[in-house]
Amino acid sequence: MARYIGPKAKLSRREGTDLFLKSARRSLADKCKLDSKPGQHGRTSGARTSDYGTQLREKQKVKRIYGVLERQFRRYFAEADRRKGNTGENLLQLLESRLDNVVYRMGFGSTRAEARQLVSHKSITVNGVVANVPSQQVKAGDVIAIREKAKKQARIIEALSLAEQGGMPSWVAVDAKKFEGTFKQMPERADIAGDINESLIVELYSR
């Protein structure tokens, strides 16, 4: 399955909620009708969505939020299921501790896609070592930084400025002047923002 490169607003409309694929700080709610499906007049249907359909829709939504494809998502779920504790929460923690997501949460990228690009273009270091794998798992205490050559990029400066205004997650500590941040700890479920019902995904894979 190829990565989707079409209009981001269409994906949010399909899920009926803002997935913040265009910006973490600017909602699409004022720009388009999120409760209307994509299409010239919005697709309508009188049929009730089945439990399976609802569960599948939730999985698709989470995949789109984090920019993860099906095979990789299945691996994340398998790992989450192997770990102790709540499988759904474990899944979200694995997704949140991806390097591209941490770069995004620290405000270095305005979207996860932009953060993923920064990692792929070798603009990021982890504990002083250049990293270029977006799916790399970040551990507590790891220091994420922007490489010197990338610190003057306008998009990074703007994204960081907006992130500072909106506030950072409690599980990261960012020094904007140094363009670096520390992954303090794995986020708790209450710390993970977003309209996500992970229990539906667990139910889907438990069928």
Curated annotation (Swiss-Prot):
Keyword annotations: Ribonucleoprotein, Ribosomal protein, RNA-binding, rRNA-binding
UniProt region (Disordered), positions on chain: 31-55
CDD domains: S4 (cd00165)
Any one GO BP annotation for this protein: ribosomal small subunit biogenesis
GO cellular component, one term: small ribosomal subunit
Domain of life: Bacteria
KW Hydrolase (keyword) present: no
Compositional bias segments (type: Polar residues): 42-53
Domain S4 RNA-binding span(s) in chain numbering: 97-160
InterPro entries: Ribosomal_uS4, Ribosomal_uS4_bac-type, Ribosomal_uS4_CS, Ribosomal_uS4_N, S4_RNA-bd, S4_RNA-bd_sf
Signal peptide: none
One Gene Ontology molecular-function label: rRNA binding
Subunit-structure text: Part of the 30S ribosomal subunit. Contacts protein S5. The interaction surface between S4 and S5 is involved in control of translational fidelity.
Its biological purpose: One of the primary rRNA binding proteins, it binds directly to 16S rRNA where it nucleates assembly of the body of the 30S subunit.
Family: Belongs to the universal ribosomal protein uS4 family.
The protein's name: Small ribosomal subunit protein uS4
